[in-house]
Amino acid sequence: MTLAAHTTEDYEELLGRVFDDQVKAWTAEAEASERFPRQLIEHLGRTGVFTQKWGDGQQPDVAKLIALALELGRLGSAGIGVGVSLHDSAIALLRRFAKNDYLRTICEQAIRGEAVLCIGASEISGGSDLQIVGTEVRSVRDGYEVRGVKKFVSLSPIADHIMVVARNVDHDPGSRHGNVVVIAVPTSQVEAQAPYRKVGAGPLDTAAVHIDTWVPGDALIARPGTGLAAISWGLAHERLSIAGQVAGASQRVIGITLARMMKRRQFGHTLYEHQALRMRMADLQARVDMLRYALAGIAAGGRLDLRAAAAIKVTAARLGEEVLSECMHIFGGSGYLTDETPLGRWWRDMKLARVGGGTDEVLWELVAAAMRPDYDGYDELIDSPTGDD
């Protein structure tokens, strides 16, 4: 057994101990109140979940990232899973790009669960275009003035620091392109608005944040021109986590639906004995298995790749939506009753996977940008019609 495999197994055992009945109770309470339990982040930090995942390096242990994501997915709460992964993705930003003690202290506090982090990227107009940033940063008094409004800032009502994507206007105030920075802003210096009412993921406290403050120079995480690269790194971490959460959630739902099929009888037979339903479930299981194997392959590679994270997130999200829809269908009328089964809530939750962390189309563009045509193969096998050359 390799050392890497041994340490990953140790981490999985740690997760098995940490995600106990107390975590399940916090999750159930959060679903009822639609508020994220800060004590969960504190618990994960105190028990070493983030410390063991990150170690001393700037790069995440990808196998442990995926192991944590699978465990979060099995909780059956997208709001809880995504909230934890967003906090951890902000840690990823700081671990790689923090260059001073001020930022390193924030990072280590977050790893210990003593501080909660969130990311402010989307502008008030919404959307995924981070190249056009309205929030402005100006150099003032050995620090920076930060002004703007961020629309979708999950965890902002309970967080201590926001990793804000902004635009430096020191040299080109009129331009809305380029000069993107990432800067840490304490939530004590901003105005978090009332959390939105959402279709699903109730516990994921998400609100607009109004920013008009000054922060010290050491709060700058990524200097002008490097902000997009930095936030892309954090997003890749989030996307890979979402894929793992979808895999964990999908497997749990399939297992519960299969139990339903074994127990429920219609027309003199169990649902499982009806071939059409059984084949439908087998198809879903096969594809969820393939997703899990793909995640294992990424874990074995040991590298957080931006394109691979985009590809597996969009593929997982679309599969997860299908899994939930089909399983809810197999539950029949009971699946549509929120007081009888959680299928309807899980179905609504899964939609977030196709929107949060980048929509399908944004992620497909990242995949498309890395595709390479095989001109040699084409020329060898295909006769070009006259006029093509």
Curated annotation (Swiss-Prot):
GO cellular component terms listed in the entry, alphabetical order: cytoplasm
Cofactor (UniProt): FAD
Signal peptide (UniProt feature, chain positions): none
Top-rank lineage group of the source organism: Bacteria
Disulfide bonds: none
Enzyme Commission number(s) from the entry: 1.3.99.-
Enzyme class, first EC level, given as a word: oxidoreductase
One example of a Gene Ontology biological process annotation: fatty acid beta-oxidation using acyl-CoA dehydrogenase
GO molecular function: acyl-CoA dehydrogenase activity; flavin adenine dinucleotide binding
Keywords for the protein's UniProt record, in alphabetical order: FAD, Flavoprotein, Oxidoreductase
Pathway of action: Siderophore biosynthesis; mycobactin biosynthesis
Matches recorded under Pfam families: Acyl-CoA_dh_1 (PF00441), Acyl-CoA_dh_M (PF02770), Acyl-CoA_dh_N (PF02771)
Family, per entry: Belongs to the acyl-CoA dehydrogenase family.
Main function: Catalyzes the dehydrogenation at the alpha-beta position of ACP-bound acyl chains. This results in the introduction of a double bond in the lipidic chain, which is further transferred to the epsilon-amino group of lysine residue in the mycobactin core by MbtK.
UniProt-recorded name of the protein: Acyl-[acyl-carrier-protein] dehydrogenase MbtN
Species this chain originates from: Mycobacterium sp. (strain MCS)
